[in-house]
Swiss-Prot record:
InterPro entries: TMCCDC2
UniProt-listed Pfam families: TMCCDC2
Tree of life domain: Eukaryota
Source organism per UniProt: Bos taurus
Membrane topology: Multi-pass membrane protein
GO annotation, cellular component aspect: membrane
PANTHER family referenced in this protein's UniProt entry, alphabetically: TRANSMEMBRANE AND COILED-COIL DOMAIN-CONTAINING PROTEIN 2
Disulfide bonds: none
UniProt entry keywords in alphabetical sequence: Coiled coil, Membrane, Transmembrane, Transmembrane helix
Regions that span the bilayer: 10-30, 50-70
Record has Transmembrane helix as a keyword: yes
Protein's name according to its UniProt entry: Transmembrane and coiled-coil domain-containing protein 2
Amino acid sequence: MSSSSSIWDIIIDYLSLSSIWNYLQATLLGETSVPQQTNLGPLDNLAPAVQVILGISFLILLGVGMYALWKRSVQSIQKILLFAITLYKLYKKGSDFFQALLVNPEGSDLTLQDNNIFLSLGLQEKILKKLQTVENKVKDLEGMIISQKPTTKREYSSDHYCSCSDCQSPLPTSGFTSTSEM
């Protein structure tokens, strides 16, 4: 059983891509958390596979969501960014929870490190405000373009009959009806 266990470990190590993932997190996000070594038996072997599944599902959901939002309209860039940030946060929470579970399998005192949550929320809020101002400017430009278009004049007939739906009368009227005219 030792040979199948070592093959399983090789496959898990190959699929986990943990060194690439750690490098990307360290360079792009500034995260340098080093995973703690544990000796949990089967759970220790299962951890990289679960992280690979989380990563693949994150990428699939990100791709499907971005494609769906992109097909709706170009104005949904704000929604695409919000979707991507939210999906990444969900992935990060799941990954952090699983890491905390590996460290403490009993489940007591599971504390997740959210030291950058306020920073990321503030940055997200600033991005959303900027996108809203850009969206408002685009709407203003659309209004200006519409107002600059030449208005087409309707051709009126030489008849002076009332054409409103209330009084479709062939008689020329002033728009008011009184009992003395009848």
